[in-house]
């Protein structure tokens, strides 16, 4: 069982073997969760009924793909959904007041992983910047190196382009959807 929603990298699991305590395990959450589920199925008493529910961390916010998929789909431009520019003005309160807008609520540092902006004044108060740093701090040196090698050049290109308005929103969507489907690829593989 993962603590809360869990972490993508080196998450903490609770099990019978850990006497109810959470223990950090090295690896990617999707792989570890699947491995634990398979282990349970292989070791269970085949004469007894059972129920196993497998709930992965992916694809929950902040959509951190496994290192082996960080560059997957990088040269693909995903189509924009028909509702991409919907402002929800004619929708019910629940839809209209939600805080899941790519334009207004998707953060550059935590959600979109532009680590280079975390010390810039405009972004220091961004929602869950501490959560982003905690995610990075969980990584092994090898995981962190892979992460930097993949994201840093793309982030620097983004910063240099200084996108605004519709161009910025489209960039946010492409970064988000690519990371989202990269996370889903890990689930598909497991």
How would you label these PLM feature ranges?
Residues 2-27, 42-47, 53-190:
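Active-site-proximal cap/lid insertion segments
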Residues 29-43:
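A Trp-anchored, charged/polar loop motif used as the substrate-binding/catalytic surface
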């Amino acid at each position: 069982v993962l603590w809360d929603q869990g972490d993508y990298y080196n998450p903490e699991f609770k099990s019978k073997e850990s006497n109810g305590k959470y223990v950090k395990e090295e690896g990617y959450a999707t792989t570890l969760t699947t491995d634990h589920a398979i282990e349970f199925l292989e070791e269970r008493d085949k004469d007894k009924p059972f129920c196993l529910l497998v709930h992965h961390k992916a694809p929950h916010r902040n959509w951190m793909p496994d290192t082996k998929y960080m560059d997957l789909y990088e040269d693909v431009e995903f189509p924009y959904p028909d509702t991409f520019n919907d402002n929800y003005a004619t929708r019910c309160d629940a839809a209209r007041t939600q805080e899941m807008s790519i334009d207004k609520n998707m953060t550059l540092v935590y959600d979109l992983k532009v680590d280079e902006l975390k010390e810039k004044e405009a972004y220091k108060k961004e929602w869950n910047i501490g959560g982003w740093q905690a995610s990075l701090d969980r990584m092994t040196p090898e995981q962190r190196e892979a992460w930097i090698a993949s994201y840093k050049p793309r982030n620097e290109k983004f910063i240099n382009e200084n996108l605004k308005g519709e161009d910025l929103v489209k960039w946010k969507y492409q970064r988000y959807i690519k990371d989202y489907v990269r996370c889903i690829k890990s689930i598909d593989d497991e």
